[in-house]
């Protein structure tokens, strides 16, 4: 029987282990035994807490999304202006912890799994909608609504695309370069729509 009060600790250890194993192997075709061994617990205990590998994988992607959401909320609260809010979201999307090799590999594996799993697809759609919505809050204060929608879609696509580039080990792009490219895109479109009225904050 698991020790009383240890469930949150063990569940987190299993989620962290799942992220490492998925990242190391670059696929979701991992076993509960491999994850349990990495977490330092028995497969039986892993099944006790999560029921199945699928449930553990869903908990793992929820953990990634939850961390990203919390970081975004904190960054937006610290922003003083709408333009700073947009920049804060861009920077959060390219934080160093999001660029860890195992995290990049896990995200790519989850995107692949979304072609088969309705729940994984649903969670990734929530992420995409949240990113777009958060960008729009800042952009709507800077340009007309239609333009804000278009800029938000483009910026979100750049964020996802530049992130995927990290999987190309032979052609990496730095965090700062990723931020700068996305900022350049936003700046160019804001200038086109606002005649340079909304300068970018220093990044």
UniProtKB/Swiss-Prot annotation:
GO terms for biological process: glycine betaine biosynthetic process from choline; negative regulation of DNA-templated transcription. Residues 31-50 bind DNA. Keywords: DNA-binding, Repressor, Transcription, Transcription regulation. Pfam families: TetR_C_6, TetR_N. The keyword Lipid biosynthesis does not apply. PANTHER family: HTH-TYPE TRANSCRIPTIONAL REGULATOR BETI, HTH-TYPE TRANSCRIPTIONAL REGULATOR RUTR. This is HTH-type transcriptional regulator BetI. The lineage of its organism: Bacteria, Pseudomonadati, Pseudomonadota, Alphaproteobacteria, Hyphomicrobiales.
């Amino acid at each position: 029987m698991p020790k009383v009060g240890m469930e949150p600790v063990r569940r987190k250890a299993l989620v962290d282990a799942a992220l490492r194993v998925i990242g190391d192997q670059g696929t979701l075709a991992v076993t509960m035994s491999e994850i349990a061994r990495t977490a330092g617990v028995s497969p039986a205990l892993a099944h006790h807490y999560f029921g199945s590998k699928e449930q553990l994988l869903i908990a793992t992607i929820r953990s990634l999304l939850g961390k990203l959401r919390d970081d975004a909320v904190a960054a937006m609260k610290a922003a003083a202006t709408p333009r700073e809010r947009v920049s804060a979201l861009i920077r959060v999307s390219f934080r160093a912890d999001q660029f860890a090799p195992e995290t990049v590999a896990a995200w790519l594996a989850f995107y692949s799994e979304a072609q088969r799993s309705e729940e994984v697809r649903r969670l990734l759609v929530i992420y995409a909608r949240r990113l777009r919505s958060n960008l729009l809050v800042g952009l709507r204060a800077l340009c007309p609504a239609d333009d804000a929608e278009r800029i938000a879609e483009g910026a979100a696509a750049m964020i996802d695309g530049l992130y995927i580039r990290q999987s190309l080990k032979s052609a990496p792009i730095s965090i700062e370069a990723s931020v700068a490219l996305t900022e350049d895109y936003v700046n160019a479109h804001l200038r086109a729509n606002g005649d340079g009225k909304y300068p970018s904050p220093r990044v």
